[in-house]
Amino acid sequence: MRIGMGYDVHKLVENRDLILGGVKIPYEKGLLGHSDADVLLHAIMDSLLGAAALGDIGKYFPDTDPKYKGADSIKLLEFVGELLNKNNYKISNIDATIIAQRPKMAPHIPTMRENIAKALNIDLDKINVKATTEEGLGFTGTGEGISSQSICLLIK
């Protein structure tokens, strides 16, 4: 068994869609990034790659490569899932947290979980997504950005 941990953060800006867990969430701002800036999926991918000792998302999807400009992170997650399969890893579970003052994430979490399960071709009960605020503290608490953390367990 192998444990992996992932973290990602992006700044909130105007004129961008807010996409988390592959879900477009209605909000006046979105996350700034080279791809769709889906911090949840990016943290999950980093935890999976880390557990398998396969590097991180920057190795496979560099922000200097124009082909990843505006990339759909669900497609990137599918690639990571295929890479794990090729290396004989099975996902035991994923537990992820979104840290954001606003908007409320609870209504969107079931769809996020479904998207992740489908992209990785695993059962829904292997994925947990939760959200919290930082009670107005720090950059996420003041609404400047959103971050996400993920931990996973892989079996070979």
Curated annotation (Swiss-Prot):
UniProt entry keywords in alphabetical sequence: Isoprene biosynthesis, Lyase, Metal-binding
Pathway: Isoprenoid biosynthesis; isopentenyl diphosphate biosynthesis via DXP pathway; isopentenyl diphosphate from 1-deoxy-D-xylulose 5-phosphate: step 4/6
Cofactor: a divalent metal cation
Binding positions (4-CDP-2-C-methyl-D-erythritol 2-phosphate): 8-10, 34-35, 56-58, 61-65, 100-106, 132-135, 139
One Pfam short name: YgbB
Gene Ontology BP, a term: terpenoid biosynthetic process
Top enzyme category: lyase
Presence of the UniProt keyword Lyase in the record: yes
Catalytic activity, as annotated: 4-CDP-2-C-methyl-D-erythritol 2-phosphate = 2-C-methyl-D-erythritol 2,4-cyclic diphosphate + CMP
Presence of keyword Lyase: yes
Record-marked site positions (Transition state stabilizer): 34, 133
InterPro entries in the cross-refs: MECDP_synthase, MECDP_synthase_CS, MECDP_synthase_sf
Matches recorded under PROSITE patterns: ISPF (PS01350)
Its EC number(s): 4.6.1.12
Entry function: Involved in the biosynthesis of isopentenyl diphosphate (IPP) and dimethylallyl diphosphate (DMAPP), two major building blocks of isoprenoid compounds. Catalyzes the conversion of 4-diphosphocytidyl-2-C-methyl-D-erythritol 2-phosphate (CDP-ME2P) to 2-C-methyl-D-erythritol 2,4-cyclodiphosphate (ME-CPP) with a corresponding release of cytidine 5-monophosphate (CMP).
PANTHER family, alphabetized: 2-C-METHYL-D-ERYTHRITOL 2,4-CYCLODIPHOSPHATE SYNTHASE, CHLOROPLASTIC
HAMAP family: IspF (MF_00107)
Subunit structure and binding partners: Homotrimer.
NCBIfam families, A to Z: ispF
Family statement: Belongs to the IspF family.
Protein's UniProt name: 2-C-methyl-D-erythritol 2,4-cyclodiphosphate synthase
